Every structure is written in structure tokens, then in C-alpha cells.
């Protein structure tokens, strides 16, 4: 009878807990994948027309981002 209780406890309690832990890890992995797809140059060029300021990366007058 004790063996049956151990098997039931394993499949009814421990197995669902381990699967729930795996499901909570997936959104973090998706966020990391999405974050890696971002290109810093594209995001800078996207924001410059909105802010309408010259960037601080280049201080020379004939730069591409300030023109």
C-alpha cells in the first residue's frame, strides 16, 4: 500500500509542480529573444525625428543623424 501512495503522490503532486515551473520560464525566454532582435542603430534613428535633437554620439556638424 505504501508503494501505491508514493506513486500517487509523485504523479499527482510532484509532476504537476515541475510542469508549472517550466511554464513560468517560457515568457522570460521569449522576452530575451525579442530583446536580442533589437538593433540599437535602428532604435536611435527611430527616436531622433520624434525628439528633434541632435544626437550626442557625434558632435561634428555634417553628421548623418543631425542632418
Curated annotation (Swiss-Prot):
Bilayer-crossing regions: none
Record keywords: Cleavage on pair of basic residues, Disulfide bond, Neurotoxin, Secreted, Signal, Toxin
GO cellular component term, pick one: extracellular region
UniProt superkingdom: Eukaryota
Disulfide cysteine pairs (residue numbers): 54-65, 55-63, 58-66
Pfam families, alphabetized: Conotoxin
Propeptide stretch(es), residue numbers: 25-51
Tissues expressed in: Expressed by the venom duct.
Residues of the signal peptide: 1-24
A molecular function (GO) term: ion channel inhibitor activity
Localization in the cell: Secreted
Annotated source species: Conus arenatus (Sand-dusted cone)
Family: Belongs to the conotoxin M superfamily.
Name recorded for this polypeptide: Conotoxin ArMLKM-01
UniProt free text on domains: The cysteine framework is III (CC-C-C-CC). Classified in the M-1 branch, since 1 residue stands between the fourth and the fifth cysteine residues.
Amino acid at each position: 500500500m505504501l508503494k501505491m501512495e508514493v506513486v500517487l503522490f509523485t504523479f499527482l503532486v510532484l509532476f504537476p509542480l515541475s510542469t508549472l515551473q517550466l511554464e513560468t520560464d517560457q515568457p522570460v525566454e521569449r522576452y530575451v529573444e525579442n530583446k536580442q532582435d533589437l538593433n540599437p542603430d535602428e532604435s536611435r534613428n527611430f527616436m531622433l525625428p520624434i525628439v528633434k535633437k541632435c544626437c550626442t554620439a557625434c558632435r561634428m556638424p555634417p553628421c548623418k543623424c543631425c542632418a
